[in-house]
Amino acid sequence: MSNRTTGPGVTAAESTPSWEPRPTPPSGAPNVVVVVLDDTGFSHLGCFGSDIETPNIDRLAAGGLRYTNFHTTALCSPTRACLLSGRNHHSVGMRWLSNLDTGFSNCRGVISKSAATLPEVLRENGYGTFAVGKWHLANLEDCSPAGPFDHWPLQ
């Protein structure tokens, strides 16, 4: 019997992969849920003192982190680019809306490939990521109902 450390074995139990193991989050790592609501302010959510009852959002806020100091433009694409990258929307190329390329490096209408996004950083650390809804961060010619879903439509 050989002393191989990787490679095929007689059975699956005896085989070991020759590739690096996929990263996994540390034990006890938190779940990360980001909720983006258009046209919503502090005065609309119960967890920020509103008279409007929002029990499910209040419950999420009570058990997690609440960010209370986020400043950006009122346009959807730049706001989402800031949220996903943690950087100013000008510095990641999303000065206006997606699909509006002015030719200037800070206004290409897409998030720069050099700007890491929260989902990318989480994936590198073993998290599974999922996004749903209208993000408005990709050029229409880069989007298709067939995907690719590992980066569509965020970049």
What are the residue ranges of the model-derived segments?
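Formylglycine-dependent sulfatase
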Residues: 1-155
